[in-house]
């Protein structure tokens, strides 16, 4: 049966909120338009709080975020009954409906104050899984790379801490798997003479597969449960210190040009420059972090697994080897490492050797 009740309240408009109070844009749903019966009580209360003409009926408490007082309980119950087409509505029934929200932690009654309630907006974000229209600051331990190919999705704040721990464990598991594959292998052999033949070298970042270290990949199962989350462009990483030198090209022997896939990119290795302290360079014990970027500026950032970091030690000559071991030559003065019969770009590679701490902490 069609309801002839008159609409109370006005459409949601975040710009019309009371000055000094900042509420989320998701406070109103699409169906909470004037005259709609499919509206929850707490949505209706927000509509009354927004409209100036109901200040004598219900109003925000001064100096308290999310706290409001019902000045005329009977009038609020009458307005709610008109909205829901229930003429027999009274404050007793309305208060029972409000107590339902206590268990849901959507709002609670303020102790010591009559007809005074307070919204728990942080809990509402988790209950309704809305789109939080803000740019969340990236974690410095997770978003150290360039903007990801698959952009991370926004997550309710109630599950961010759990997802953060799970992502850290996933990063460490990925590191252990990669180091386990590289440790038993000797110097890799390239097959540049044979076109079309695949190389047996594990090249980090050379495969065009899905992003396995990005936030969106670790949240795949969660995204399937959340309705329609939006994405945002993560901020650019902070500028690097002046004592860091960028080594262009992969640290493993590159595949022949005919075998390069269209989606592959050439990672860069970031190592401390010659202006840093001699001996061992110390890094905080961070897991392996990688950022997959777009265009020619894509980079793969490798950080040490242990607090000792990278150690540079003198070593005998090694140009006799046809390939380069991933645990070997890293020099800040080198711009590209070449394999096979090509000569090395810097003669200083003959007396330097980089030792990776491959065993997990």
Curated annotation (Swiss-Prot):
One Pfam entry name: Ets
CC annotations in GO: nucleus
Keyword set, alphabetical order: DNA-binding, Nucleus, Transcription, Transcription regulation
InterPro entries in the record: Ets_dom (IPR000418), ETS_fam (IPR046328), WH-like_DNA-bd_sf (IPR036388), WH_DNA-bd_sf (IPR036390)
SUPFAM superfamilies per the UniProt record, alphabetical: Winged helix' DNA-binding domain
GO terms for MF: DNA-binding transcription factor activity, RNA polymerase II-specific; sequence-specific DNA binding
Gene3D superfamilies: Winged helix-like DNA-binding domain superfamily/Winged helix DNA-binding domain (1.10.10.10)
Segments for region (Disordered): 178-201
Entry similarity comment: Belongs to the ETS family.
GO biological process, one term: cell differentiation
Location within or outside the cell: Nucleus
Gene: ETV3L
Designated name of the protein: ETS translocation variant 3-like protein
DNA-binding region: 39-120
Organism: Homo sapiens (Human)
PANTHER family: ETS, ETS TRANSLOCATION VARIANT 3-LIKE PROTEIN
This protein's record includes keyword Transferase: no
Chain's role: Transcriptional regulator.
């Amino acid at each position: 049966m069609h309801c002839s009740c008159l609409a109370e309240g006005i459409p949601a408009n975040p710009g019309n909120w009371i000055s000094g109070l900042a509420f989320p844009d998701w406070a109103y749903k699409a169906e909470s338009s004037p005259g709609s019966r499919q509206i929850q009580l707490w949505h209706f209360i927000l509509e009354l709080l927004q409209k100036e003409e109901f200040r004598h009926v219900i109003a925000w408490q001064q100096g308290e975020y999310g706290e409001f007082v019902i000045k005329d309980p009977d009038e609020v119950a009458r307005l709610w009954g008109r909205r829901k087409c229930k003429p027999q509505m009274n404050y007793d029934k309305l208060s029972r409906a409000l107590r339902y929200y206590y268990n849901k932690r959507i709002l609670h009654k303020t102790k010591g104050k009559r007809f005074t309630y307070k919204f728990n907006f942080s809990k509402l974000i988790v209950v309704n899984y809305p789109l939080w229209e803000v740019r969340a600051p990236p974690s410095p331990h997770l978003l150290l790379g360039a903007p990801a190919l698959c952009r991370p999705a926004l997550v309710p704040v109630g599950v961010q801490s759990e997802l953060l721990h799970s992502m850290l464990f996933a990063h460490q598991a990925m590191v252990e798997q990669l180091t386990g594959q590289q440790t038993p292998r000797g110097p890799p052999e390239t097959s540049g003479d044979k076109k079309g033949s695949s190389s047996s070298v594990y090249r980090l970042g050379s495969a065009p597969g899905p992003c396995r270290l990005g936030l969106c990949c670790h949240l795949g199962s969660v995204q399937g449960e959340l309705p329609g989350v939006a994405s945002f462009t993560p901020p650019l990483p902070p500028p690097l210190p002046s004592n860091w030198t960028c080594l262009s090209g992969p640290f493993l022997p590159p595949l022949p040009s005919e075998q390069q896939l269209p989606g592959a990119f050439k990672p860069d290795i970031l190592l401390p420059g010659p202006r840093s302290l001699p001996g061992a360079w110390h890094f905080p014990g961070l897991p392996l972090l990688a950022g997959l970027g777009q265009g020619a500026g894509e980079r793969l950032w490798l950080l040490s697994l242990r607090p000792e970091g990278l150690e540079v030690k003198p070593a005998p000559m090694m140009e006799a080897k046809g390939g380069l071991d991933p645990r070997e030559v890293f020099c800040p003065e080198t711009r590209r490492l070449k394999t096979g019969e090509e000569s090395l770009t810097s003669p200083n590679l003959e007396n330097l050797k980089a030792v990776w701490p491959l065993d997990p902490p």
